[in-house]
């Protein structure tokens, strides 16, 4: 399947967001946290992250990440959580279009990868130029029907 890191069969639904302007570090930690969850529960967690009621526990990029009560190091990545909510809504609509039961969907695969880099240069004094690079992020999710 072009563009996806794993192949899917007919009883799976998939969705992608290409070149999202979010932090790679936040996206990797959110993807790790929601992998294997039921789709409705993952969407509820991400909505709680947006309202800053639930902290995403960080497993990677932990330098100077503060401890959260009962979870260890974590943060509230609001901007990335909004993009993941859109991604999960897209895959839910795709599953509904394929005739799958949307109440029993389980996140089988979710990944966040580096996309294209936007290169900007800011003029500085004495003819120099300062680099201002930004990485864009590619997200993908695959869901399957689970047992009820």
Curated annotation (Swiss-Prot):
<keyword id="KW-0694">RNA-binding</keyword>
<dbReference type="InterPro" id="IPR005721">
    <property type="entry name" value="Ribosomal_uL22_euk/arc"/>
</dbReference>
<dbReference type="InterPro" id="IPR036394">
    <property type="entry name" value="Ribosomal_uL22_sf"/>
</dbReference>
<keyword id="KW-0699">rRNA-binding</keyword>
<comment type="similarity">
    <text>Belongs to the universal ribosomal protein uL22 family.</text>
</comment>
<dbReference type="GO" id="GO:0022625">
    <property type="term" value="C:cytosolic large ribosomal subunit"/>
</dbReference>
<keyword id="KW-0687">Ribonucleoprotein</keyword>
<dbReference type="GO" id="GO:0003735">
    <property type="term" value="F:structural constituent of ribosome"/>
</dbReference>
<comment type="subunit">
    <text>Part of the 50S ribosomal subunit.</text>
</comment>
<protein>
    <recommendedName>
        <fullName>Large ribosomal subunit protein uL22</fullName>
    </recommendedName>
</protein>
<dbReference type="GO" id="GO:0002181">
    <property type="term" value="P:cytoplasmic translation"/>
</dbReference>
<dbReference type="GO" id="GO:0019843">
    <property type="term" value="F:rRNA binding"/>
</dbReference>
<comment type="function">
    <text>The globular domain of the protein is located near the polypeptide exit tunnel on the outside of the subunit, while an extended beta-hairpin is found that lines the wall of the exit tunnel in the center of the 70S ribosome.</text>
</comment>
<dbReference type="Pfam" id="PF00237">
    <property type="entry name" value="Ribosomal_L22"/>
</dbReference>
<comment type="function">
    <text>This protein binds specifically to 23S rRNA. It makes multiple contacts with different domains of the 23S rRNA in the assembled 50S subunit and ribosome.</text>
</comment>
<keyword id="KW-0689">Ribosomal protein</keyword>
<dbReference type="InterPro" id="IPR001063">
    <property type="entry name" value="Ribosomal_uL22"/>
</dbReference>
